[in-house]
Amino acid sequence: MFGKGGMGNLMKQAQQMQERMQKLQEEIANMEVTGESGAGLVKVTITGSHSVRRVDIDESLMEDDKEMLEDLIAAAFNDAARRVEETQKEKMASVTGGMQLPPGMKMPF
């Protein structure tokens, strides 16, 4: 079924892929991504594991209404989270050779 050494090679390839994926998970968890809203007036920087590192608010917004500022912060965070997801997909595709995860299945972090 697997031919000469086929099963051994298959197991070795699976182990190598698992090691690459573990390294990738660590790399993604430590990366920082910045999302923006209000044409860059609000910036939120998060890690690959979605921990907020920084929130930068342009001084000009400090006198505007509170509700608008809250909306801009939420939008900037959502933009950063979307960017993390895109980066995860791109990096995962490079490890899996473009093989996609089943719908609804996410990386374990």
Swiss-Prot record:
Residues 1-22, 88-109 are annotated as: Disordered. Its main location: cytoplasm. GO terms for cellular component: bacterial nucleoid; cytosol. SUPFAM superfamilies: YbaB-like (SSF82607). It is found in: Cytoplasm, Nucleoid. Pfam families: YbaB_DNA_bd. Keywords: Cytoplasm, DNA-binding. It comes from the Bacteria. GO terms for molecular function: DNA binding. PANTHER family: NUCLEOID-ASSOCIATED PROTEIN YBAB (PTHR33449:SF1). Belongs to the YbaB/EbfC family. Homodimer. Binds to DNA and alters its conformation. May be involved in regulation of gene expression, nucleoid organization and DNA protection. This is Nucleoid-associated protein VP2178.
